[in-house]
């Protein structure tokens, strides 16, 4: 082939050729005797934007064991991408306390109840993985635990078939655009967590998908713009769409300039990391009126024809061997740097920090509230769902067109971190890691929900209980209260 193995690009090219050869030959072999044989090639994650491999799969299986390294946010983000593809998909969790190969390990039944409920809430079919021991006998305890979860699935299935996700926001995947596909892309995962914890209705997109149906399009942190993407974004804006750009997103793919008019000048990357942000009052967390630390370097912008959304404050110096300060970094100087932390101009809102990567890495509630307030500024009264749910709860809104109804899913399963690495184990044992588990499923009470739905609603039912609940319509919004629920509640609106 004339490829030099010492050149990384050549090695990657050969790897792609070998993988394509594998897909082609193994798929053909599986279908020698049956052309409609279901085939799925598992890789631990569905790579966003890799549409070239979809032709080798009859369906998609979203391997995502929360205790096996994927965590509880991987599956929702993955499901919100594959739901936009023309393939059936199922969630794949495991019965293990940790991960594959853990014979004698049992996940708490409540965890499997929650995980299967989440699969239904995100439009997926359900799969729970096990491994068969050498004697070939199924483990009774395992299947009692699985049976408990599947009994609930069976009771809910009729409200979960042939659904489509309702979304205000399209999250353009950084992994899809940049071609970098780690299991947890920091920008994508950070943005996904913000949207999940803020209870926004959203889809995850690649650059080939239709942007026009979304009220807001988010480009998280590191999406530089090609000519083809620029044309698509310009059309989206011309049709009334709104953009949230952060960090490097919006810059030209080959030059350090913004391809769209964000209402500010770009003066490059700030030399200070961390630095500080004092958002404008409309974006500030309710409990913060001082500059907040942001660990990743921001872009240096100065507002021109846009409206400033806050100010950047610099530290006294970057902490180093030459300049030392305490345990982490120096405080903010008392006066602003002269650079803006964000700007809004027309239908484009830009934040100078890679805020989603920052949230992925540090998870500060103040940072989340800053970003949520920015998204709400764009959505304004067009937001489809408001609620008083805590950030750890999850919600989706599905439509069942054939049944002419909507299904609101509410999920609540608080996680606890357990375990951790130790060194004094026998060499025959795999080293443990910290894992997230669900054990208790406490109830949430007096959950208020306000929905903006385009169709008239005449009835609201709690399912599968079959209990009707009251609601009111005010300012073209359906408002209702769920007295109490645990784990998963469906509210069917027809």
Segments predicted by a language model, with ranges:
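Carbohydrate-binding surfaces of carbohydrate-active enzymes
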Residues: 4-494
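Cysteine-cluster motifs in flexible loop/terminal segments that predominantly coordinate metals
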Residues: 1
